[in-house]
């Protein structure tokens, strides 16, 4: 069915049976904004543990765009590309990442919430994704992305709800589908990604 299969990577899991269908699902490639799922997962984990509150605020200083693994602030998103020293709530930052794929919001969360992708973050997300989640090079496999998306779904928190209403619901997995979809896209260069939970009966 798929021509030129070396240029694609597909991982599909039926969550109620654990059955998997895949093509090149262990092929590592530049994941772009799909890597932001790691930040969203970790923030939700800490929210569930009551270590964070949605009302918590973080200041947008120049430092948040300058640590290893930070996204280019000139990329996607609506928050000011230049540091404004304003405080942003955790709730608004998470919505900005999940719904607008905001690079600056990701950097603010990465700087403060994950402590610049420290060992605690890495250990937590690696365990959830069942592999090393690389926030520096942002190279991931379809299987890793799908596995972490399933973990976000299993958390059953605010994040999966935010991902169910995004700026990108008219494209990729959610395009022309009449069932709810929670998804995170990621584009860069020739890479066009999407990782999603499709709320449908099986088979779909």
Task: Describe the function of each predicted region.
Residues 1-24, 197-198:
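A short, well-structured edge-of-sheet supersecondary motif
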Residues 6-8, 17-19, 54-56, 141-144, ...:
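Envelope-exposed proteins and targeting segments
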Residues 15-17, 26-28, 45, 63-65, ...:
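Solvent-exposed coil/turn segments that connect beta secondary-structure elements
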Residues 18, 30-58, 97:
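Active-site SXXK
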Residues 22-29, 94, 134-135:
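A short glycine/serine-rich beta->alpha loop
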Residues 62-63, 69-158:
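Active-site-adjacent helix/loop patches that line small-molecule binding or acyl-intermediate pockets
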Residues 62-74, 163-176:
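Short, mixed-charge aromatic SLiMs
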Residues 170-204:
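Short, Gly/Ser/Thr-enriched beta-strand-loop segments that form substrate-interacting elements
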């Amino acid at each position: 069915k798929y021509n030129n299969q070396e240029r694609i990577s597909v991982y599909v899991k039926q969550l109620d049976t654990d059955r998997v269908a895949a093509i090149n699902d262990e092929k590592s490639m530049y994941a772009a904004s799909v890597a932001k799922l790691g930040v969203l997962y970790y923030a939700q984990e800490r929210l569930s543990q009551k270590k964070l509150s949605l009302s918590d605020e973080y200041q947008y200083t120049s430092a948040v765009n300058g640590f290893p693994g930070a996204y280019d602030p000139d990329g996607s998103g609506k928050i000011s590309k230049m540091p404004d020293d304003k405080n942003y709530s955790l709730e608004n930052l998470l919505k900005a990442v999940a719904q607008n794929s905001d690079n600056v919001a990701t950097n603010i969360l990465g700087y403060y919430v994950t402590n610049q992708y420290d060992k605690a973050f890495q250990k937590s997300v690696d365990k959830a994704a069942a592999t090393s989640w690389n926030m520096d090079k942002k190279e991931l496999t379809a299987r890793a992305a799908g596995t972490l998306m399933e973990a976000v779904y299993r958390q059953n928190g605010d994040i999966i709800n935010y991902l169910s209403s995004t700026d990108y619901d008219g494209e990729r997995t959610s395009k022309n589908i009449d069932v709810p979809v929670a998804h995170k896209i990621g584009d860069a260069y020739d890479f066009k990604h999407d990782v999603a939970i499709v709320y449908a009966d099986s088979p779909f």
